[in-house]
Amino acid sequence: MKILIYMDSEKYHHPPVMMGKIIAKATDGEINVLVVVPKGGHPENGEAVAEQVKLDLEGYSPKVFVKQGKSREIIKEELDREEYQLVIADTDRINRFKKSIEVDPMFIKQSAISLLLTQQTKPRINKILLCTGCKEDDYSLINQASALAGDLGAAVTLLHVFPGAVPSMYTGLEQIEETVDEMLQTDTPFAQYLRRGVEILKENNIASEVKIRRGIPIEEIVRETQVENYDLVVIGSSMVDKGLLEMLLGNLAVKIINRIELPVLVIGTRTLA
């Protein structure tokens, strides 16, 4: 896996570097680090961040680049130069990015590259919350998450949230949380998708469970992270409309970042390998 860690020169953020180490170690990945100095900024600050990165990534042989200019242009140039599978950035940086850069849908047209936004990063990833929209016949999200979980040695909870009221096909079930087994035995597209998802996880020797909720998706995702001790939340790029920049700025991703004090991985279409 080829990983790009995105840093800025204003302040050294350790979580992206820590997460880069965790994933690179598990996947035998290659790490590049891009330190961006804004126009009018001090290049020596960027060099100081770069030196700290090299110390923290000792043993991983990272390539560290310090560049000055507009963040958007520098990131695009680097992503055009190399075929990365994963970009890691800190949420503090994303919030500043959101305030300072107008969304340009043509900036990055595809949603191929996975994006990992770090906060409250733990030294190990043991438990992953995988949020699925149950897209019929599309198991790419589960396949990608399963492969990563296998490399990390992590367990996976597969969560699906029915927006609003419980679907009419399940009317009469008093507590949807308590009837997962019953729902999985039906022939509905949701049940078929989740059953296949569990099979994929089992095929990869991943310890797993399925949880089903009803309500506002973001609220149910937040609630789940509050009652269980997860280390990483995973969503699909289909939850965001346009490319990597939209992953950074898209409404759902921003809501999740703002509400969940955990690293969030948005999985793109390019294989994490």
Q: Where are each of the predicted segments found?
A:
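Small/aliphatic-rich secondary-structure junction motif
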Residues: 1-45, 58, 127-179, 200-202, ...
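Short, surface-exposed alpha-helical segments at coil->helix boundaries
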Residues: 17, 43-51, 187, 191-195
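General small-molecule cofactor/ligand-binding pocket signal
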Residues: 32-34, 63-67, 116, 157-159, ...
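Short, hinge-like loop/turn segments at secondary-structure boundaries
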Residues: 49-51, 134, 174-177, 227-228, ...
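Charged docking surfaces used in two-component/phosphorelay signaling
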Residues: 66-74, 213-219
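Gly/Ser-rich helix-loop-strand patches that form or flank binding pockets
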Residues: 76-124, 223-273
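A short acidic, glycine-rich active-site loop
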Residues: 178-189
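A short, acidic, amphipathic alpha-helical segment used as a generic capping/interface helix at domain edges
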Residues: 193-198, 215-226
